From Swiss-Prot:
One of its GO terms (biological process) is monoatomic cation transport. A motif (Cell attachment site, crucial for protein stability) lies at residues 178-180. The lineage of its organism: Eukaryota, Metazoa, Cnidaria, Anthozoa, Hexacorallia. Residues 139-154 are annotated as: Trp-rich region, which is important for the binding to lipid membrane. Residues 37-46 are annotated as: Plays an important role in the hemolytic activity. The keyword Transmembrane applies. The record marks 147 as: Important in the initial contact with the lipid membrane. Octamer or nonamer in membranes. Monomer in the soluble state. Residues 20-34 form a propeptide. This is DELTA-actitoxin-Aas1a. Its main location: secreted. Pore-forming protein that forms cation-selective hydrophilic pores of around 1 nm and causes cytolysis. Pore formation is a multi-step process that involves specific recognition of membrane sphingomyelin (but neither cholesterol nor phosphatidylcholine) using aromatic rich region and adjacent phosphocholine (POC) binding site, firm binding to the membrane (mainly driven by hydrophobic interactions) accompanied by the transfer of the N-terminal region to the lipid-water interface and finally pore formation after oligomerization of monomers. Residues 45-64 are annotated as: N-terminal region. Belongs to the actinoporin family. Sea anemone subfamily.
């Protein structure tokens, strides 16, 4: 009988030791997922929330003109990065290369370092698997006495790289949205639609969701 009791105690201790690590792993896995939500990363589309963009802005540091961008792909198409064109400002990260449907890309931008009176303004382009281009424009000015935050999304027929011409089209001609702390939406054509939000401050957040129309 005593042998059975000892065996039972040993088995119980072994099982307890095996079970203990599980309690420690779960928080670590959550921390790992959170750490992936940085500019230049691709995350699950459902994880694109404002708090993610807040962390990107915090990581940029003490820069008075900066932007955190998140674009969710629910288009049913895969996206492949082509390029970013900066009219002013820059980014220290690479535009995420491949964004499958169901995922979201994270990106950022900031004014040029140093005592220069510039904002962060630009456009980036993605080739979609249907042969067309998705373009996203953002404009965070230096002087809010003269300018405001603006953003835009547009699909172009065929493959079109981001450049000055694309920026001018999206900023001046293609009905851009003002960064007014509100949500806006539109039909993009090619079976797609979008909704997005941009705030009005110099630490800008741009959240966009592209989906089937």
């Amino acid at each position: 009988m005593s042998r059975l009791i000892i065996a039972f105690i040993v088995v119980t201790m072994v099982c307890s030791a095996i079970a203990l690590p599980k309690k420690k792993v779960e928080p670590l896995e959550k921390d790992e997922k959170r750490s992936l939500a940085v500019a230049g990363a691709v995350i699950e589309g459902g994880n694109l929330v404002m708090s993610v963009l807040d962390r990107i802005l915090e990581a940029i540091g003490d820069v008075n003109r900066k932007i955190a961008i998140g674009v969710e792909n629910q288009s049913g198409k895969s996206w492949t990065a082509m390029n970013t064109y900066f009219r002013s400002g820059t980014s220290d990260v690479v535009l995420p290369h491949s964004v499958p449907s169901g995922k979201a890309l994270l990106y950022d931008g900031q004014k040029t370092r140093g005592p220069v009176a510039t904002g962060v303004v630009g456009v980036f382009a993605y080739a979609m698997s249907d042969g067309n281009t998705l373009a996203v424009m953002f404009s965070i000015p230096y002087d809010y006495n003269l300018y405001s935050n603006w953003w835009n999304v547009k699909t172009y027929s065929g493959m079109k790289r981001a450049d000055q011409s694309m920026y001018e089209d999206l900023y001046y001609h293609a009905s851009p949205f003002k960064g007014d702390n509100g949500w806006h939406s539109r039909n993009l054509g090619y079976g797609l639609k979008c909704r997005g939000f941009m705030n009005s401050s110099g630490a800008a957040k741009l959240e966009i969701h592209v989906s089937r129309a």
